[in-house]
Amino acid sequence: MWASAALLFFLQSADYTTEGLKALDAAKYDQAADLFGKAVAADPKDYAAHFHLALSYTMLKRDADSLAEYKKVLELKPGLYEAELNAGILLIRDKEPADAVPYLQQAVDQKPKEFRPKLYWAQALLDSGDLAKAEQQYRAALDLDAKSAAAELGLAHALAKQDRLADAVPHFRAAAQLDPNYRDGLLELAGLFEKNHQNAEAIAIYQEFPENAAAQEHVGQLLLESKHSADAIAPLEAAMQKDPTAANRLALATAYLFEKQFAKALPLLDQSVAAEPGNYSLHMMYGRGLRDSKKYDPAAQQFFQATKLKPDSREAWNELAGMLYMLEKFPESLGALDRAHQLGDDTPANYYFHAITYDKLRALKPALDYYREFLARSKGEFPDEEWKARQRAKLLDRELSKR
């Protein structure tokens, strides 16, 4: 990656130079840095020694020292192509692309037909936000090397960041076709489709990666979001088998719940709750799964745990009230309904459930009052319950009038 010049003839100390170059070739970078440091000390104006010292520091990832040496080289020998190029690459590596731009532009100006400086200049422009110019330079790089996967992917990024996703697609594809190592760029493209709410396009790409658990998880999640829970099950099962993370387990459980496959969903939810006992949403989800499979006692336990975690949740108190009612624990159910009402639940449903629960307890007067309040508030919203409420209200009124 790094440019190297045949600068041996510029060195003042043959011994330091010879041994330093041998150390560089043998990847003994500490030794090379020491030797070239001595050469620089012997002749501070020897730009070739400074260059090789910079290169040694680069290999040691002593980037600040390396950059200082490249700057010294350019001070002693302005416009040295190899130093311009290496300094620019180094600044890109250190995530200072704006500072890299002038070095790389000068390298391109010196050798406009060279592919590498043009590619790195394009990357520096892209990373520093000059998207239109980055696009221009990536296209110029591809004119010099049409088989560069790196240039294709860079051009794809430049286009995508300009909100030209449709234009970017063929370049993501080209990069993947030119070099299998760039195939993960397609996953990036799928993520961009997701952000753009193009779920069908994202799913199609993720499905090209059947062995990638994360990709299959995304397929399942997108299908769930698109209300295609049945189609989501297979990819989520595959993702769970390859990578049994908490997220994959929950997504698969969700798909099973939507498809009413409670026997498969409930064990997964039990594991999820055990792994995160302080997660309110998981207790609510597990409770509803148990409720829908008519397992009212364990459902009530989950909703009770939810009320402990979030005591101000009207939703949790209402769910708990419903399960206690089904378990014929009517006084406890009333207590939960009262708590939901205290928290602001003034809906017709709350009055209706109060009414039927008091009715079960044969508390006729409060039952009648709640039926009447429900009817006053419902106003046709719940026709079936309104019919039942009217019938019960008539009967209760008669019974009370006989007393």
Predicted regions and their residues:
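N-terminal leader/linker segments that initiate helical-solenoid repeat arrays
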Residues: 6-52, 59-61, 68, 401-403
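Helix-start (N-cap) detector for alpha-helical repeat units in TPR-like alpha-solenoids
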Residues: 13-14, 47-48, 81-82, 115-116, ...
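Register position in tetratricopeptide repeats
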Residues: 25-26, 59-60, 93-94, 127-128, ...
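Canonical positions in the second alpha-helix
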Residues: 38-39, 72-73, 106-107, 140-141, ...
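Structural marker of alpha-solenoid helical repeat scaffolds
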Residues: 42, 76, 110, 144, ...
